[in-house]
C-alpha cells in the first residue's frame, strides 16, 4: 500500500495502472502490485453504491478503519506491525470481528464474513458482528446484490474446508432466508427416523455437504450435495415424514436456483443428475438390470464416464449424511458400468435395421449387467 501519493505521481515513477475501479499499479521491475490508500463514502444502496477518495491526504489509519474485519485491518512497515484495531488479538483468539459500524454499508460483507468463517473453520464470528450482519439482513440491502456476485462468494465458500459453516453463519444472521430461501425452507422438515436419525432435512443437507467435502474438492460434487434434497421442502404435508417423489419435485427448484445465480452448466447439470437419480442408486440392489442400464444412460455415463464418478461420490455422501456405514451400492454400480465399457457388440453391428441394432445392444448390455455379482 502506498500512502501520500497520487495516481499521476505513481505513473511518473514508472508504475503501470491496472485497476479499473481502484488505483492499483504494477512495479516497473518486480511487477508487484501497489495500491493507493483510500476511503469510501456510501452514496447509494448496494455493494457498488460508493464514491472513493484516493487523494494523497488519506492516511493509513483512515484506510484501515474502512476495512471489513480486524484481522484484515493490519499493515506492516519496516517490519513494524501497525494494528490500530487489535487485529492481532483477534487473530490469536480466533475471532472474526468487524472494525466499525461502517461494516453495514456494504451488504457483500455478510457473505465475506460467512466465507471467512468457513475458510478458518476454527474461528468464531463475534456476536456483535452477527448482530450487525442481522441488521444488514433486515435492511433490505442484501436484495441489491446480483446473482453473479452472490455466486462468486458462494463458489469461494464451497472450496473451503467446511462450506457448511458458510450457510450456518448466514442462517444465524438471517441472511439465509433472504438469499437462499430454498435452503432455509429445509429447516424443520421432518424425515423418517429409521432412515434419517440425524434429524430434519436441513441437518441432513449440512451433513451430506460435510461428507462430500471430505471425499472431493470438486465444486460439482459439493454443489450437488448441497442441493440434492431441495424437493423435500415442498413435500405435501399429508405424506410427511416420508418424501415420495422429492427427487422429481426438486428438479425445478434446482433449475431456478441455478438460473438465479448463473451456475456454470457443468455444476448445474450434475446437481440435476444427482437430484433425479440419487434414490435409484441407494436401492440399486433391488433394481432390474434394465433399470440399472437406464440409470447409467440417464447419467450419460457412456459418453462422459466422469459423470458416474461425480454421481457416486454424491450418493455416498448422501448415505454417510444419515448412516455412518459402508456403501456397497457405489462399487456395484461401478462394476456394472465396467462390464459394459468393453462389451463385444459385434453381434449387433451385423444387423441392418438401426432400430434392431439398438435393441440388440440394449439386450447385450442387460445380459452383461445380470452377470455382475450382487454379493459384497
Give the residues covered by each predicted segment.
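Catalytic cores of the polymerase beta-like nucleotidyltransferase superfamily
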Residues: 1-376
Amino acid at each position: 500500500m502506498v500512502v501520500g501519493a497520487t495516481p499521476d505521481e505513481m505513473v511518473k515513477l514508472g508504475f503501470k495502472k491496472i485497476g479499473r475501479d481502484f488505483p492499483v499499479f504494477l512495479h516497473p521491475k518486480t511487477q508487484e502490485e501497489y495500491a493507493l490508500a483510500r476511503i469510501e463514502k456510501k452514496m447509494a444502496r448496494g455493494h457498488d453504491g460508493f464514491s472513493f477518495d484516493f487523494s494523497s491526504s488519506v492516511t493509513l489509519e483512515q484506510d484501515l478503519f474502512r476495512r471489513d474485519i480486524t484481522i484484515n485491518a493490519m499493515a506492516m512497515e519496516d517490519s513494524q506491525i501497525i494494528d490500530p484495531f487489535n487485529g492481532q488479538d483477534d487473530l490469536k483468539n480466533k475471532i472474526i470481528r468487524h472494525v466499525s459500524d461502517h461494516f453495514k454499508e456494504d451488504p457483500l460483507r455478510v457473505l465475506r464474513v460467512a466465507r471467512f468463517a468457513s475458510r478458518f473453520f476454527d474461528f468464531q464470528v463475534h456476536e456483535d458482528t452477527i448482530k450487525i450482519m442481522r441488521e444488514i439482513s433486515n435492511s433490505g440491502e442484501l436484495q441489491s446484490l446480483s446473482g453473479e456476485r452472490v455466486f462468486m462468494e458462494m463458489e469461494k465458500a464451497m472450496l473451503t474446508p467446511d462450506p457448511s459453516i458458510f450457510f450456518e453463519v448466514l442462517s444465524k444472521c438471517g441472511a439465509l432466508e433472504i438469499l437462499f430461501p430454498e435452503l432455509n425452507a429445509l429447516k424443520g422438515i421432518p424425515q423418517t427416523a429409521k432412515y434419517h436419525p440425524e434429524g430434519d432435512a436441513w441437518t441432513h443437507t449440512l451433513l451430506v455437504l460435510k461428507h462430500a467435502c471430505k471425499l472431493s474438492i470438486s465444486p460439482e460434487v459439493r454443489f450437488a450435495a448441497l442441493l440434492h434434497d431441495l424437493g423435500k421442502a415442498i413435500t405435501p404435508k399429508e405424506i410427511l415424514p416420508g418424501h415420495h417423489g422429492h427427487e422429481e419435485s426438486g428438479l425445478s427448484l434446482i433449475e431456478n436456483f441455478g438460473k438465479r445465480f448463473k451456475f456454470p452448466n457443468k455444476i448445474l447439470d450434475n446437481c440435476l443428475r444427482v437430484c433425479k437419480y440419487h434414490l435409484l442408486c441407494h436401492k440399486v440392489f433391488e433394481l432390474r438390470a434394465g433399470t440399472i442400464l437406464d440409470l447409467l444412460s440417464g447419467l450419460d455415463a457412456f459418453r462422459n464416464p466422469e459423470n458416474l464418478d461425480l454421481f457416486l461420490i454424491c450418493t455416498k455422501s448422501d448415505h454417510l449424511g444419515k448412516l455412518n456405514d459402508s456403501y456397497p451400492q457405489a462399487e456395484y454400480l461401478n462394476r456394472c458400468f465396467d462390464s459394459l465399457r468393453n462389451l463385444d457388440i459385434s453381434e449387433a453391428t451385423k444387423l441392418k435395421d438401426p432400430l434392431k441394432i439398438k435393441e440388440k445392444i440394449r439386450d447385450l448390455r442387460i445380459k452383461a449387467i445380470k452377470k455382475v455379482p450382487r454379493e459384497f
